[in-house]
């Protein structure tokens, strides 16, 4: 009987000492699916083409960080289908912006 009480108290102590919530480290993916390329672009032409585009200069943490990173270099955050020589075809605003 004493062994059972000691075992239960030990398990209870371990359970209470564990962290209440485990924070998951999920990487931010700004663009997915067909529009899978994250870009910072200067000019949008009716959502069909974007001009003067480049990869974001920093690793992105969230949608707001993506927007501010591109804004810091005078460009807009975009998710594009096909980047070709600084011009991107079919772009849209990233989710969360």
UniProtKB/Swiss-Prot annotation:
One of its GO terms (cellular component) is extracellular region. The keyword Secreted applies. Disulfide bonds join 31-79, 40-70, 41-53, 80-91. It is found in: Secreted, Cell wall; Secreted. InterPro entries: Cerato-ulmin_hydrophobin (IPR010636), Hydrophobin_sf (IPR036686). Its main location: secreted. It comes from the Eukaryota. Pfam families: Hydrophobin_2. Residues 1-17 form the signal peptide. A chimeric hydrophobin named NChi2, synthesized by grafting the Cys7-Cys8 loop from EAS into the corresponding location of NC2, was found to be able to self-assemble into both rodlet and monolayer forms depending on the incubating environment which suggests that NChi2 can function as a versatile bionanomaterial for various applications. Keywords: Cell wall, Disulfide bond, Glycoprotein, Secreted, Signal. Homotrimer. Further self-assembles to form highly ordered films at water-air interfaces through intermolecular interactions. PANTHER family: HYDROPHOBIN (PTHR42341:SF1). Belongs to the cerato-ulmin hydrophobin family. Aerial growth, conidiation, and dispersal of filamentous fungi in the environment rely upon a capability of their secreting small amphipathic proteins called hydrophobins (HPBs) with low sequence identity. Class I can self-assemble into an outermost layer of rodlet bundles on aerial cell surfaces, conferring cellular hydrophobicity that supports fungal growth, development and dispersal; whereas Class II form highly ordered films at water-air interfaces through intermolecular interactions but contribute nothing to the rodlet structure. This is Class II hydrophobin NC2. The lineage of its organism: Eukaryota, Fungi, Dikarya, Ascomycota, Pezizomycotina.
């Amino acid at each position: 009987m004493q062994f059972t009480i000691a075992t239960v108290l030990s398990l209870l102590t371990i359970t209470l000492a564990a962290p209440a919530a485990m924070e998951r480290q999920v990487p931010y993916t700004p663009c997915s699916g067909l529009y899978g390329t994250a870009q910072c672009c200067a000019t949008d032409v009716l959502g069909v083409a974007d001009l003067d585009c480049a990869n974001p200069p920093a690793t992105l943490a969230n949608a707001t960080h993506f927007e501010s990173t591109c804004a810091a270099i005078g460009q807009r955050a975009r998710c594009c289908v096909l980047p070709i020589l600084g011009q991107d075809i079919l772009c849209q605003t990233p989710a969360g912006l």
